[in-house]
């Protein structure tokens, strides 16, 4: 059939039914189309309007119904493991995550550290830390090559955090890494390195919450000899005359020219307002447009394969359609740059079942205790999200064994693990992180066939943790339970004719009994042809009504978590 005839027929049918792609009665003509768009925008308190960057038209439109046509690409389902460089200027002081907020909360560790080492927050605010972020030893090519060598199949870079500082040559944020600090396009360095080494490239963007997150920068001391002297969050461009930041407007960074959120002086209120409810200050039209423009700038300039938002559902949702329009642009742009095939992956948190059809569900530092129908991701970190010297000094990093346990558990449930490895401000990891990653990489080199390209088995696992009820807290935060895993805990994956049984520890008896593979099991009714230990070879096994019992060798190959390859 002729394409022109098909298009005409489709339009005739739409007119006959008096509908449009948005579900609003079709009336025809540009003026009436604009009216339909205006009607659609009335659903949102702060819709995108007057932005500089145009949303790309294509297969998808900015509605949930349209976006539910998304299908997770096979490359992501096969990849299973990625590394994240959650790295930026908040690493300078070594105070850990949310440092640029915590440094304004009187009495906090970050506040005390900043006051002692850098000065009073009225005179030295976070804006003054930015020039100290030099990235002087940062070698993205060397880092990405190493991440690939330990098993990463995709790589994520931080584009901006809640601190609102852009780590690229940003068109819409003058407070960026080309103008201040490293004087480098960090995203360009990461993107080029990832693609040189054959890794898919992702960007995480978090700055939409700067609006409320930075509110403590407007506080002042309640104790001491400078009570009531405001911190630097109130400053404007006019205040910079004669200072290093002359010509820059601190409000472009802090975004505090608005009424405070309800309960703003409560230090813990920010989390409960993450979904823009519970009294959170409503972002302005200009701020929403600015984040939208910055995000499309990243998509258009760096063409990421993956895009991550640290939000409930999508940026500014449900106040704005900005997130829906960003998702639409991301998918359509990806299709246009991948020969008509959708290869993009977009992440959001706290998604309902319908929203999980439109994008990929991300769980922070945790996992559901069940198999999940749609592919999903858990993001975690071996330490704090931003580099924390206290974690280093107190040996509080996750062990390689814990990382393997998390990976096996997540993959058994149809998920991927995105692991953050904190970098110091100069762009390097420390020797303790290196030792952990080396050990993890050794395990992956022996056992990765039980991870890559696999799919969940009939059940995800067996053992005390598998049979317990572990709830997700908000967006995650239950991974501590999985760090307690022993050899009793087994996780399953499958590929072709093989089942992989990953024991999350080496049994003292040198025997593994897999109850789910007992004779007459509801999960596997056929025979077991052979069993081998990856990295070792074939093993003796006995199957009866109690389970499949396998004798392990004395030599503890892959002692972190032995993997049995079971041919059926």
Predicted regions and their residues:
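N-terminal cationic leader/targeting segments used for protein routing and processing
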Residues: 3-4, 19, 31-33
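Mature catalytic domains of secreted/periplasmic carbohydrate-active enzymes
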Residues: 24-568
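Bacterial N-terminal signal peptides
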Residues: 9-20
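Bacterial N-terminal signal peptides that target proteins for export
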Residues: 1-10
